[in-house]
């Protein structure tokens, strides 16, 4: 089961929405198996920017011996993040593709698909990076709020919740005259990449009031703040392959 997230939406240049579920559970793992504990420690190392520890752990463990669970898929995901951080894009792609092959039903597989999509754009679209930089500048300038009708909550990444890791993602996106969101992109996030995918998937489902006279802003920017809350621990040891 994918747990609902606790998050705050900050409209850039506008009022802050009050926090939701700010309490944090202690960083403990009761009855954790070795794969889950190893994956959780890797996420905590990544939170601190320590990809060397993630990569050292990856070199020591035998993932083939791990069951095909969310913990295993999430470990592969953070390996891919670190490969991107090291600018080893070929290794990142292969890691994400392996995740899709071996854990196609996992939450982490959705994030892997998002990263592969972005990597394809970076490789094939010469104007992509300039477009992202333009979106970043627009986000910093703020935006006139369109009236929201439906905001689907972002889902908290399961292993990040277990590891009690918080963070944020800033999403810049268009809103069509009829109120659909269009082409959301991440312009800032911390820890890098960790909440990007879930933030994008949520914003794609959002709906705004229509703008029949065309007087409202076509671009919006929202900062999603993710705060781990005391909730049922997600099942990271359930099978994630058919």
Which residues are covered by each model-predicted region?
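Bacterial Sec signal peptide processing site at the extreme N-terminus
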Residues: 18-41
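Acidic, low-complexity proline/glycine/alanine-rich linker and hinge segments
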Residues: 117-161, 200-205, 230-238
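A short, well-structured alpha-helical segment
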Residues: 165, 176-212
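Short solvent-exposed coil/turn linkers within tandem alpha-helical repeat scaffolds
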Residues: 63-71, 100-115, 189-193
């Amino acid at each position: 089961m994918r747990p609902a997230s606790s998050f705050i939406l900050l409209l850039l240049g506008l009022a802050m929405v009050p926090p939701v579920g700010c309490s944090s559970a202690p960083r403990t793992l009761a009855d954790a198996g070795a794969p889950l504990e190893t994956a959780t420690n890797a996420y905590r190392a990544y939170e601190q920017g320590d990809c060397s520890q993630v990569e050292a752990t990856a070199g020591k463990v035998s993932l083939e011996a791990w069951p095909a669970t969310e913990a295993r898929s999430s470990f592969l995901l953070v390996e891919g993040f670190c490969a991107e951080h090291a600018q080893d894009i070929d290794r990142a792609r292969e890691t994400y593709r392996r995740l899709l092959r071996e854990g196609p039903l996992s939450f982490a597989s959705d994030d892997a698909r998002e990263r592969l999509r972005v990597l394809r754009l970076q490789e094939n679209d010469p104007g992509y990076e300039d477009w992202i930089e333009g979106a970043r500048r627009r986000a910093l300038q703020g935006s006139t709020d369109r009236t929201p009708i439906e905001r689907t909550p972002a889902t908290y990444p399961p292993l990040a919740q277990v590891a009690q890791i918080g963070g944020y993602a800033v999403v810049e996106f268009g809103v069509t005259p009829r109120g659909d969101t269009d082409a959301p992109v991440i312009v800032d996030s911390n820890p890098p990449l960790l909440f990007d995918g879930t933030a994008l998937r949520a914003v794609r489902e959002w709906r705004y009031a229509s703008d029949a006279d065309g007087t409202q802003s076509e671009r919006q920017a929202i900062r999603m703040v993710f705060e781990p809350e005391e909730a049922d621990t997600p099942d990271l040891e359930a099978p994630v392959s058919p």
